[in-house]
Amino acid sequence: MVTIVYASQGGSSKRYAEWLSERLDAPCLPIGSVPDGIDDDIVFIGWRSGPAIVGLGEITCRDRVIAVICVGLERYDEKAMETIRRKNSVENLFYVRGAMDRRCLRFGQKLLLGIVSVKMRLFDRSPEDKEVRRVMDRGGDLSSEDQLDPFVSWFGNR
């Protein structure tokens, strides 16, 4: 049996957990509700903050985690994923794009995003960078259930 565990601040990780729960017919729990000594395999869904996956370190039964789904704004980047995989000691890592609701951010997070946005405005000019900057500045949603397809395929073949 598998349980989906998520850490969510703005709602994207929770939405992906609920979509995955329906597709796998598996329960999903917020990170604070995982019982000690859980016997199920765990699929963890958390959001990216730099190279960290928020909430992953809070799982006390880390040996039960069979895969991690990382939620972020940027397009998939293999080099960044390799860094995240290494820094978080995750073998089976998947990536999906999420949403940003600026109302859910703390002051420090808004400040940091403002700095990143200015840097992107000055140095990054690709259409993808402009899309991410727009979502960072105004909020927006890049999530879709079909982004879970690579994970679902992997899960069915393991």
Which sequence ranges carry the predicted segments?
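Glycine-rich phosphate/pyrophosphate-binding loop and the adjoining helix
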Residues: 112-158
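Helix-loop-strand module that forms the ligand-binding subsite of alpha/beta enzymes
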Residues: 32-108
